[in-house]
């Protein structure tokens, strides 16, 4: 079942939720201090401008519950509001907080099977708005959605943005989408993340992406890109690329192991070498023991680390999570 099928199946429940959000009595609003309370929604406020006015007033509330309600309000109301009014309000808004609200509403329309150009407008502003805080806000609005399926090479462009804030938000989107939308099991999402990481000239962004995504579904081209990053001038990038290689699909494991074994002897950073040992162990399980034994003399300071891996791998545990747990237990016992 596709994401679009699920979206259409959920339309009825979305409408019910929207109506409940628009109900006159809002319990969250009651939690606000009297000075911060906004009036209950009235029929006249159930318009784009009415909702925006309510949100502007309410965002100063001391009640976090009320602000959470406001964050959901416009997004969940999006399918009932005129698309042209919503888009026009988005285009003329320059307060980053309100931009994020409006962008999330437009994204929601596309996610729920309505006009695709709604999300396209958000993506275009993320790429082209002159204000980096606005660009960052629109990127956050696309987080944990299917945006990467509809926006082409947007993320490869965003990770090269002049603003560090924008680059960081783009990297966060890629990681959170990979883990929380696709569960690390979507090849397109994984390959998009790797392509963006390789395209970035910001070592922190590249490391953030490669060090956190799941790479079990990446294609051969993505594996080659990760292998090339093992030669990066940044130790942080080399360590993250090493971690990413440890999780590649079975068809790419031999190539990944060969790359890591070939780079280990020339690597000078102990943290990167330690990451390489872990990925070699992960790629080979018990079959990695002879390789680890041959590496033992390269760096005497890491001999205890290698010995710990060898001891755990010789237990023939069949789950990586169990291997990690036992390795941690051995380290704590030392």
Predicted region positions:
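Bacterial N-terminal signal peptides
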Residues: 12-24
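Alpha-helix N-cap/helix-start positions at coil->helix boundaries
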Residues: 60-64, 95-97, 132-133, 164-165, ...
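Terminal, low-structured helical/coil segments at or just beyond the last alpha-helical repeat
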Residues: 297-334
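Alpha-solenoid HEAT/ARM repeat scaffold
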Residues: 64-68, 96, 100-104, 136-137, ...
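Alpha-helical adaptor scaffolds
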Residues: 211-214, 235, 239-265
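N-terminal leader/linker segments that initiate helical-solenoid repeat arrays
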Residues: 27-86, 94-97, 103
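Amphipathic alpha-helical scaffolding segments comprising HEAT/armadillo-like alpha-solenoid repeats
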Residues: 41-57, 79-91, 112-126, 147-160, ...
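Alpha-solenoid repeat junctions
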Residues: 74-78, 106, 110-114, 142, ...
